[in-house]
Curated annotation (Swiss-Prot):
Xref: PROSITE patterns: GLOBIN
Subunit composition and interactions: Monomer.
Keyword Heme carried by entry: yes
SUPFAM superfamilies documented for this protein: Globin-like (SSF46458)
Start and end residues of each Globin domain: 11-150
Residues reported to bind heme b: 74, 106
Keyword Amino-acid biosynthesis listed: no
Entry's family note: Belongs to the globin family.
Protein name as catalogued: Globin
Coiled coil feature spans: none
A GO molecular-function annotation: oxygen binding
Keywords annotated in UniProt: Heme, Iron, Metal-binding, Oxygen transport, Transport
């Protein structure tokens, strides 16, 4: 299933949730490194996205990005937001509330182009569980909610 950022997706099944938790656990247990690797892959594959991160401007190499405290800080925030979504899979109202709040911040305060949520979600899905339809469904749920304030 490709990741979508509009419309709706079917609820996650119990089997999908179990598989997501199993795939996510080793990534989150090493969240500092995993988060930086994901964010660096995102920026090196989509350099235009860096314009929304003034502190990252001018960092053109993966090595520069990996050494940046600002990149590490933001990577941790992204990983924690995904972890919150994984932890809230059984309480979609809680997940929705948190991600809608995050959407508002990104739309109003940071003025991030929402197309990049889907791109980042694809990098995360590829890193965590490449080709897994359940994880892609979770990433779709996240993307749809992150676009809610736009």
């Amino acid at each position: 299933m490709p990741i979508v950022d509009s419309g709706s997706v079917a609820p996650l099944s119990a089997a999908e949730k179990t598989k997501i938790r199993s795939a996510w656990a080793p990534v989150y247990s090493n969240y500092e490194t995993s988060g930086v690797d994901i964010l660096v892959k995102f920026f090196t594959s989509t350099p235009a996205a860096q314009e929304f991160f003034p502190k990252f401007k001018g960092m053109t190499s993966a090595d520069q990005l990996k050494k940046s405290a600002d990149v590490r800080w933001h990577a941790e925030r992204i990983i924690n937001a995904v972890n919150d979504a994984v932890a809230s899979m059984d309480d979609t109202e809680k997940m929705s509330m948190k991600l809608r709040d995050l959407s508002g911040k990104h739309a109003k305060s940071f003025q991030v182009d929402p197309q990049y949520f889907k791109v980042l979600a694809a990098v995360i899905a590829d890193t965590v569980a490449a080709g897994d339809a359940g994880f892609e469904k979770l990433m779709s749920m996240i993307c749809i909610l992150l676009r809610s304030a736009y």
